[in-house]
Amino acid sequence: MTNIRKNHPLMKIMNSSFIDLPAPSNISSWWNFGSLLGACLALQIITGLFLAMHYTADTMTAFSSVTHICRDVNYGWVIRYLHANGASMFFLCLFIHIGRGLYYGSFTLSETWNVGIILLFTVMATAFMGYVLPWGQMSFWGATVITNLLSAIPYIGTNLVEWIWGGFSVDKATLTRFFAFHFILPFIIAALVMVHLLFLHETGSNNPLGTSSDSDKIPFHPYYTIKDLLGLMFLILLTMTLVLFSPDLLGDPDNYTPANPLNTPPHIKPEWYFLFAYAILRSIPNKLGGVLALVFSILILAIIPMLHTAKQRSMTFRPLSQSVFWVLTADLFILTWIGGQPVEHPFITIGQMASILYFSLILIIMPMASLIENKMLKW
């Protein structure tokens, strides 16, 4: 058996990635979220495949087909809510995974980090297009508002929007292509995950101390397979609690009303995981400025390795940087809350202040805190 595991062309790839992989002996539970993201992706692909068997990508029947899945298909409601809430779990794990990378300085593994940023954008695009498919009020108006942002691009903007729509408004052509993209993108994500892991295994994992682990490695199996399984149990517990007790907790009631181009909902807002970026978009009165702020709120992750001024890799022994990190976390919670509120006083002002603070913390305050710590340590 050992020979097959180590010599078979396919098995030896699996073996070197998940069984005999040398891993740092001290990685904490914050390192569990990579495998949890893999589990979420698998869940989304499987549930999505079964949903696609019953869904019809047509403006006349899309809403009815989703209703049919929930009412008439065997356990269709479970599959549908697993898929919807699975997306929320995906983003929850994604945000924690990125946060862990920031806190422990994993962004110094630049290839892995950059592929991760591409993955984040791809997952966000997939989730956005998936939200359009049930063809409820929020699906339709969300698609209209977000695709319309591209019209802010000078000269080619309007043509670009109409090209994406496949007409002069969000209609049948838009829904059909969004379904096609929503189906193919998870497989592209799976391929990018392979690249992400390939780059990670070139350098090996970081650890909570931010030091080299070369002198102290342990095999991935059984130590971290068991540890990942424990994390998976907690994830399953949380997901199933959500699906079976309050499946619509994170959804929008407006999406239970069929799409109506003649009636705009009072508050157009995306799913909770996009609210922080939506708040940043809305906090700038200028359309192009808002779109740029929206893009840069995510793209800013790409320049974080360049802003790393500390002499230590991890924040484990840097209390000042830790404080800045948790202020940033709190700021993201505030932005998420503001994104779900109507555009009126005092929410506008709070949103603008939180947006300025978000960019200031990453671009100015964090590098300065690191420099102060260097001075305190006489480095």
From Swiss-Prot:
The chain crosses the membrane at residues 33-53, 77-98, 113-133, 178-198, 226-246, 288-308, 320-340, 347-367. GO terms for cellular component: mitochondrial inner membrane; respiratory chain complex III. It comes from the Eukaryota. One of its GO terms (biological process) is mitochondrial electron transport, ubiquinol to cytochrome c. Pfam families: Cytochrom_B_C, Cytochrome_B. The keyword Membrane applies. Its cofactor is heme b. One of its GO terms (molecular function) is ubiquinol-cytochrome-c reductase activity. Keywords: Electron transport, Heme, Iron, Membrane, Metal-binding, Mitochondrion, Mitochondrion inner membrane, Respiratory chain, Transmembrane, Transmembrane helix, Transport, Ubiquinone. Gene3D superfamilies: Cytochrome Bc1 Complex, Chain C. Heme b b566 binds at residues 97, 196. A ubiquinone binds at residue 201. The keyword Metal-binding applies. It is a multi-pass membrane protein. Binds 2 heme b groups non-covalently. Disulfide bonds: none annotated. It is found in: Mitochondrion inner membrane. Heme b b562 binds at residues 83, 182. Its main location: mitochondrion. Heme 1 (or BL or b562) is low-potential and absorbs at about 562 nm, and heme 2 (or BH or b566) is high-potential and absorbs at about 566 nm. Belongs to the cytochrome b family. Component of the ubiquinol-cytochrome c reductase complex (complex III or cytochrome b-c1 complex) that is part of the mitochondrial respiratory chain. The b-c1 complex mediates electron transfer from ubiquinol to cytochrome c. Contributes to the generation of a proton gradient across the mitochondrial membrane that is then used for ATP synthesis. The cytochrome bc1 complex contains 11 subunits: 3 respiratory subunits (MT-CYB, CYC1 and UQCRFS1), 2 core proteins (UQCRC1 and UQCRC2) and 6 low-molecular weight proteins (UQCRH/QCR6, UQCRB/QCR7, UQCRQ/QCR8, UQCR10/QCR9, UQCR11/QCR10 and a cleavage product of UQCRFS1). This cytochrome bc1 complex then forms a dimer. This is Cytochrome b. It comes from Hapalemur griseus (Gray gentle lemur).
